[in-house]
């Protein structure tokens, strides 16, 4: 959630920055609500003060033997007016809060202005795409020749479209990838491995920004009742990991907090009908190793560079060509202030495809979660800055290996970094 000060003290500039990312802030409507808030807040305070004064006068009048009935009636009337004003103010604040919940984060000044992915800016490339001397197959056809290692037909029978059953060496390779990623991030990059619930409540989804705006993208498994909140399957481990700090005040000495987790992720892919219908690229259920950092405000942009670099290391160790892209204002996620995408080369598509998205959220999520740390200089709690990124999407990494490492005889070479995780197996044979 945006800092209310941005909307109260500099709404025109805030609207301009939001427009750069395609969001139209109704300045007139918000300004009108803000004026009403000021008026009601002032009236509520005046009524409170007046009632306090009158209440004190009752005691004095009673001590002097005066008739206090008129004063009691007056205080009672003021109390009724105060209750009405408080109720009206509460309703107005709820309206303002609802409006504010739908406003995305402000883009950082270093983010290029643009409408969509066509306006993203390439920062760098690593590795050279391989030149093949045979006809390249996509990952679906490659896996079909490897004991039908990616079985979409059976998954469709079991569940429906956009699911997969993995078997044999492909399933082992998928598991090896997740283990390799976790080991790299915990042993080389200083992250703490976490195991988290795959079901979360509405407060958690609100904290990281999925609710209320993106509820249709989620799988909801349990509706809210009088006894408690509903539960939804996690769309990313970012949700449970980041929400660990919800309603907490961390010791500054513990920062930065760096966490990683391997989880399945569940997304309805609402709005993606007809896109990437073949293969693993866009599934309802997919595995991902997530990276989350909780840092001091002054450290967040350096942390973004570091976190992105940690994801890059995985691609480099796997010897997969990729490029690093800075997203434009119109292509960033709802809560992001600045985002880098890492896109891996897929020879069957003859293009780069997203395999990781790394974002600095500033205090946008922390304000929603009330995730804070105690500043040792002021001894007062301040909002944390939160960052997250994929390190990496396991399924898409599997796709990249199957396509980039395929051989003319239908086999696939195992990346050297994964051989120890495959019990020494260097080739997956057809």
UniProtKB/Swiss-Prot annotation:
HAMAP family referenced in this protein's UniProt entry, alphabetically: Ser_tRNA_synth_type1
Q: What does this protein do?
A: Catalyzes the attachment of serine to tRNA(Ser). Is also able to aminoacylate tRNA(Sec) with serine, to form the misacylated tRNA L-seryl-tRNA(Sec), which will be further converted into selenocysteinyl-tRNA(Sec).
Question: Which lineage is the organism of this entry classified under, starting from the top rank?
Answer: Bacteria, Pseudomonadati, Pseudomonadota, Gammaproteobacteria, Alteromonadales
Pathway annotation = Aminoacyl-tRNA biosynthesis; selenocysteinyl-tRNA(Sec) biosynthesis; L-seryl-tRNA(Sec) from L-serine and tRNA(Sec): step 1/1
| Protein known as | Serine--tRNA ligase
Its top-level enzyme class, in one word, is ligase
Q: Which GO terms describe its molecular function?
A: ATP binding; serine-tRNA ligase activity
The record's annotation in PANTHER family points to: SERINE--TRNA LIGASE, SERYL-TRNA SYNTHETASE
* Organism of provenance: Alteromonas mediterranea (strain DSM 17117 / CIP 110805 / LMG 28347 / Deep ecotype)
Family indicated by similarity: Belongs to the class-II aminoacyl-tRNA synthetase family. Type-1 seryl-tRNA synthetase subfamily.
A GO cellular component annotation here is: cytoplasm
């Amino acid at each position: 959630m945006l800092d209310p000060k941005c909307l109260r003290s500099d709404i025109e500039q805030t609207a301009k920055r939001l427009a750069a990312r395609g969001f139209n802030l109704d300045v007139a409507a918000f300004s009108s609500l803000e004026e009403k808030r000021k008026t009601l807040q002032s009236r509520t305070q005046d009524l409170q003060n007046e009632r306090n004064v009158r209440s004190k006068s009752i005691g004095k009048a009673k001590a002097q033997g005066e008739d206090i009935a008129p004063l009691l009636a007056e205080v009672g009337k003021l109390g009724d007016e105060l209750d009405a004003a408080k109720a009206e103010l509460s309703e107005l604040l709820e309206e303002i809060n609802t409006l504010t919940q739908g406003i995305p984060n402000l883009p950082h000044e270093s983010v290029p202005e643009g409408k969509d992915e066509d306006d993203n800016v390439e920062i760098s490339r690593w590795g050279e795409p391989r030149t093949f001397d045979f006809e390249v197959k996509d990952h679906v056809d490659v896996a079909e020749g490897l004991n039908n290692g990616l079985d979409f037909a059976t998954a469709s029978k079991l569940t429906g479209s956009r699911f997969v059953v993995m078997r044999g060496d492909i399933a082992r390779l998928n598991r090896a990838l997740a283990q390799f990623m976790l080991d790299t991030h915990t042993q080389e990059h200083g992250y703490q491995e976490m195991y988290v619930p795959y079901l979360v409540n509405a407060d958690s989804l609100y904290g990281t920004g999925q609710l209320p705006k993106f509820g249709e993208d989620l799988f909801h498994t349990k509706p809210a009742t009088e006894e408690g909140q509903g539960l939804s399957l996690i769309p990313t481990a970012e949700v449970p990991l980041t929400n660990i700090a919800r309603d907490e005040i961390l010791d500054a000495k513990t920062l930065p907090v760096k966490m990683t987790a391997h989880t399945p992720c569940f997304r309805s892919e609402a709005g993606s009908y007809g896109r990437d219908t073949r293969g693993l690229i866009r599934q309802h259920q997919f595995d991902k190793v997530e990276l989350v950092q909780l840092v001091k405000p002054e450290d967040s942009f350096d942390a973004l560079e570091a976190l992105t670099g940690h994801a890059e290391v995985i691609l480099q160790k796997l010897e997969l060509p990729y490029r690093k892209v800075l997203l434009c204002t119109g292509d960033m996620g709802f809560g992001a202030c600045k985002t880098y995408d890492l896109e891996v080369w897929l020879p069957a598509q003859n293009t780069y495809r997203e395999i990781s998205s790394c974002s600095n959220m500033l205090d946008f999520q922390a304000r929603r979660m009330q995730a804070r740390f105690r500043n040792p200089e002021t001894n007062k709690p301040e909002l944390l800055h939160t960052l997250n990124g994929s390190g990496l999407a396991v399924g898409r990494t599997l796709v990249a290996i199957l396509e980039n490492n395929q051989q003319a005889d239908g086999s696939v070479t195992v990346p050297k970094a994964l051989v120890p995780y495959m019990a020494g197996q260097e080739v997956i044979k057809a």
